[in-house]
Amino acid sequence: MKNLLLTFLVVTIVCLDLGYTLICNRVHGLQTCEPAHKFCFSKTVMPFPNHPLTLMGCTYSCPTERNAVCCSTDKCN
């Protein structure tokens, strides 16, 4: 009986994420954020005329630019 309970405990620990980490979209794939990063962001910049560049990922605080999107749930950007 003790072995069964121990097995369930191990499976629970392995299957559950003990510390919540935010997951944000990137241009190519997903990014698991560090614990200090609380927001996902997306913003478009124009480094050259007619060549927009989209930046996406995790951040400590929300960008203040008017073309930036900031959110705090998984894959929201």
Swiss-Prot record:
Cysteine pairs bridged by disulfides in the record: 24-40, 33-58, 62-70, 71-76
Cellular compartment(s): Secreted
Keyword Transmembrane: no
Primary location class: secreted
Annotated site (Key residue for inhibition of muscle alpha-1-beta-1-delta-epsilon (CHRNA1-CHRNB1-CHRND-CHRNE) and important for inhibition of neuronal alpha-3-beta-2/CHRNA3-CHRNB2 nAChR): 46
MF term (GO), any: toxin activity
GO cellular component: extracellular region
Superkingdom in the source lineage: Eukaryota
Annotated site (Key residue for inhibition of muscle alpha-1-beta-1-delta-epsilon (CHRNA1-CHRNB1-CHRND-CHRNE) and important residue for inhibition of neuronal alpha-3-beta-2/CHRNA3-CHRNB2 nAChR): 48
Pfam families, per the entry: Toxin_cobra-type
Protein name per Swiss-Prot or TrEMBL: Short neurotoxin OH-32
Natural source organism: Ophiophagus hannah
